[in-house]
Amino acid sequence: MDIKNLSLKDIKFPKSWETKPSKIEYMQFVYQEAIDMKVWRKDNEIDILTHHHVTDLSRFFWPNADFEGLVLGAELMVWFFAFDDLFDGGFIDDNENEQYRLVNRMNKVFLEGTIEDDSTGAERMGYYLRNKVRAICGEKRQSTFHRFNSSCVQWVDSIIPFIKLKRNQKSLDFNLYIHHRKFNIGAIPCFLVSEIILDPMSNIECFIWLDSRWIKMSEIICEIIALVNDCVSYEKEIKENGAPLNSLKFIQIEKNLNLQESFEYISNYLNELINQYIELETSFIKSYKPITSNYNSNFIAIVEHLHNMSFANVSWSTQTPRYLSQTQPFLELRRNKKIITKIYDLKNK
């Protein structure tokens, strides 16, 4: 693949959306939890590096959270990876019956609060996460708990349809892809974790988060995160499998564009989304400012976190070894992979 000089700076995020990641002390705690639930294999080098990669997102997504908040975010990331890897890691290949069986079992974890005797590590982490969120929310915050559960079920249910898109890749349409991907990216459960972390006393009226503008704002951020992920993972996916479900790739085919033109198309689309989001956010905050005066700081923190997460995804992507290489088409990712040796001596803790 020819090296291009593309830049993520062509995506015009407002300066106010930028954040700095927090510290990493929570990683060891969550690693031990995942070992106990048999999500990871103890002292396995691959699992240790995977754990760092997966849980590192928490400090970028929730930079202002306390230790418990960072742990909750990291647990969610481990669950995402552990379940998705059953499908992406080649464990069940194209066995559709097994795919539906795993989806139905995981849905029962969140819908019924039950777990099978022969549970997988992903199911154990999901069960633990569900019960933990329920305990945190208590009786006063049942709406938050149920919306978190619903968002997790929605993500689980998105996996098989997204797999099926791969089988129809020759006729893949950008709008169809975006519709599926904004749920499959897994950002909506993250938004609910933000609400749990940033409004601990549940002072904010729950109906506010049912406003159609807030729901649309959430979906826009999902789209932004999904498309940025396609950009930063483009080279990696091309090398691994030809990137059949990468928008930067299939837009080239669909519209007969080169890589530069395809990225220009996506960056323009992203910039339109950002502008649309800003308009909605301004209207949303203005509408509820009079009734949120008693807890305005929490309300604003949750709203700001929604857009901050989209830039945090960019920040994380430009430093994770997962995407760095000397042949990256994106200038911000074009350097040697970092060797993770001093993050945590997880084997000896």
Swiss-Prot record:
The keyword Transcription regulation does not apply. GO terms for biological process: sesquiterpene biosynthetic process. Induction: Expression is detectable but at low levels in vegetatively growing cells and increases during development induced by starvation. Expression is highest during slug formation (approximately 16 hours after induction). Expression decreases during culmination (from 18 to 24 hours after induction). Keywords: Lyase, Metal-binding. The keyword Metal-binding applies. Gene3D superfamilies: Farnesyl Diphosphate Synthase. Pfam families: Terpene_syn_C_2. Terpene synthase that converts its substrate farnesyl diphosphate (FPP) into the sesquiterpene (3S)-(+)-asterisca-2(9),6-diene. Is also able to convert geranyl diphosphate (GPP) into a mixture of monoterpenes including (Z)-beta-ocimene, allo-ocimene and linalool. This is Terpene synthase 2.
